[in-house]
């Protein structure tokens, strides 16, 4: 019987830590290695951001966060698909990244971390 309350407390602690981490990142604002995106609507457009991070020291995207730092939330499945398509299909060579979804203030925020690429330059393909 003691296990269940412990697990519930542990789960709520992890949620709080995750939420605090996202708030910490948002408080830093946008900078050379961090960008906020309200949503991802086009894999080709986001490929430019991914390639820019991959060509420098890497960086992170907080998707579901407005430019002013307000959390808007996202439907993560579509954004995850767009990031995957951008990194694998529209960046040459491909970009190494990781994604994690955080539940913050009742909304989903997708954190995408892009590693610096060993093979540079990374090009973002466009229609031309």
Map each language-model feature to its residues.
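Conserved N-terminal catalytic/coupling substructures associated with nucleotide/phosphate chemistry
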Residues: 2-128
């Amino acid at each position: 019987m003691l296990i269940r309350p412990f697990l519930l407390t542990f789960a709520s602690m992890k949620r709080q830590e995750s939420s605090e981490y996202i708030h910490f990142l948002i408080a830093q604002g946008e900078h050379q290695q961090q960008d906020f995106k309200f949503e991802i609507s086009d894999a080709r457009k986001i490929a430019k951001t991914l390639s820019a991070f991959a060509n420098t020291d890497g960086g992170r995207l907080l998707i579901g966060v407005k430019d002013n730092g307000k959390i808007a939330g996202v439907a993560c499945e579509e954004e995850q698909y767009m990031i995957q398509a951008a990194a694998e299909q529209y960046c040459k060579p491909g970009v190494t990244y990781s994604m994690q979804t955080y539940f913050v203030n009742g909304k989903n925020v997708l954190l995408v971390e892009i590693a610096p690429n060993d093979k540079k330059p990374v090009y973002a393909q466009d229609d031309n």
